[in-house]
Amino acid sequence: AIESRGFVFASAVSYILKKPFIMLRKKNKLPADVHSIDFELEYGTATIEVHKDSLDENDNVLIIDDLIATGGTAEAATKLVEISKSKVTAFIFVINLFDLGGSDNLVKNNYKVENLIDFPGH
C-alpha cells in the first residue's frame, strides 16, 4: 500500500486475503534499512521507501492506493518492488483521474489495473 490513504483500503484487502500488508512510506518514516526511490510529481519531487526485508525474491505484489492521477507514484512503487526482486502483478485504485493518463500508462506497460471509480481530473 502507498502512504497514506492507500493503507486504509489495503489493510482490509490484506486481512480478507490473509496476505501480508506492506507499507510504502514517505522518506524517513520507516525504522529499519530501506530501499528508496525519488520520483516526480505534478507539483515537485518526492521519495518513497520500503523496508528491505518486507519483500522476498519472486513475491507477487498487488499495489493498492486511493487515487491515480499521472501515475508517478505508482511507477515509483513498481520500481521499489522490482528493486526487491519481486513482481507487481496488479494495481487497484479507488479513484482514477482518467484524463491525466496514469492508469492508461500502467495498462500500456502490461500491468493489470482495476479502478473502482473513474472521474475527470480537470
Regions found by a protein language model. Name each.
Residues 1-3:
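Short glycine-rich phosphate-binding loop at a beta-alpha junction
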Residues 5-8, 28-30:
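Short, catalytically relevant binding-site loops at active-site mouths
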Residues 8-17, 78:
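Short Gly/Thr/Asp-enriched flexible loops that form oxyanion-binding sites at enzyme active sites
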Residues 11-12, 33-35, 101-104:
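Short, well-ordered secondary-structure micro-motifs
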Residues 17-20, 86:
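A short helix-loop-beta submotif of the ANL/AMP-binding
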Residues 19-61:
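Short, glycine/charge-rich flexible loops or terminal/linker lids adjacent to PRPP-binding catalytic cores
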Residues 66, 71:
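Conserved G/P- and acidic residue-centered "switch" motifs that form tight phosphate/ATP-binding loops
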Residues 75-122:
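PRPP-dependent phosphoribosyltransferase catalytic core
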